[in-house]
Amino acid sequence: MNRRHRIYEGKAKILYEGPEPGTYIQFFKDDATAFNAKKHEVIDGKGVLNNRISEHIFSHLGRLGIPTHFIKRINMREQLIKAVEIIPLEVVVRNVAAGSLSKRLGLEEGTVLSQSIIEFYYKNDSLDDPMVTEEHITAFGWAVPQEIEDIMQLSIRINDFLSGLFAAANIQLIDFKMEFGRLWEDEAMRIVLADEISPDSARLWDMQTREKMDKDRFRRNMGGLINAYQEVAKRLGIINENEPPRPSGPVLVK
């Protein structure tokens, strides 16, 4: 069996050299991490569900004309994606107070915000991903003003779509994290959505019960993470009500 060239390994995914120039294979791991990997556990089946959910969301966004790195899902754990130059920022869109926003500003968790808030965090685990301003971003050369504007506009469009998508599934989108990258095509460059959107990167609550259906179940030692992710997938129509879980999926050749 052929050994693949590993490009990068993060906390939840591995990037491998793709079959064609300008492509990667993105492999979804079962690792669950929190607090910049200070808390870590392997949860069988998490990567499979995140792959399916992220594929579903990115496919919808692509049909809406929102540029992404996604090409297609290859199998239960892998996607074929376009190679992009990742901008070292986490972009967080908040619709409801929760998590660090509640702690930072003393807001009761669950408080609906009068308008959606977009925040930027510098991707650096050793610094615990500090929040930064647009001035920091341009001063340190992480992105230029036009790129920031593109990211802001895309974030608003993505939030509008996802809020409706999840609401139709009786799920409230509390907040979510995104990453963006530069995609070079011939001499032209454009900003595209990268990474993933899944219950790992979004806070999702049941609209009636306010039950958490995301990685907070791991962060807060609530248990039931796989069941929650499966429920999200079922409500989005990704898996059938009676479809048995297939946790492990193919074994990756390293």
From Swiss-Prot:
Enzyme Commission no: 6.3.2.6
GO cellular component terms attached to this protein's record: cytosol
One Gene Ontology MF term: phosphoribosylaminoimidazolesuccinocarboxamide synthase activity
InterPro entries: SAICAR_synt/ADE2_N (IPR028923), SAICAR_synt_PurC (IPR033934), SAICAR_synth (IPR001636), SAICAR_synthetase (IPR050089), SAICAR_synthetase_CS (IPR018236)
Enzyme class, first EC level, given as a word: ligase
Source domain of life: Bacteria
A matching Pfam family: SAICAR_synt
Disulfide feature: none
Catalytic activity from the UniProt record: 5-amino-1-(5-phospho-D-ribosyl)imidazole-4-carboxylate + L-aspartate + ATP = (2S)-2-[5-amino-1-(5-phospho-beta-D-ribosyl)imidazole-4-carboxamido]succinate + ADP + phosphate + 2 H(+)
Similarity-based family: Belongs to the SAICAR synthetase family.
The protein, known as: Phosphoribosylaminoimidazole-succinocarboxamide synthase
Gene name in the database record: purC
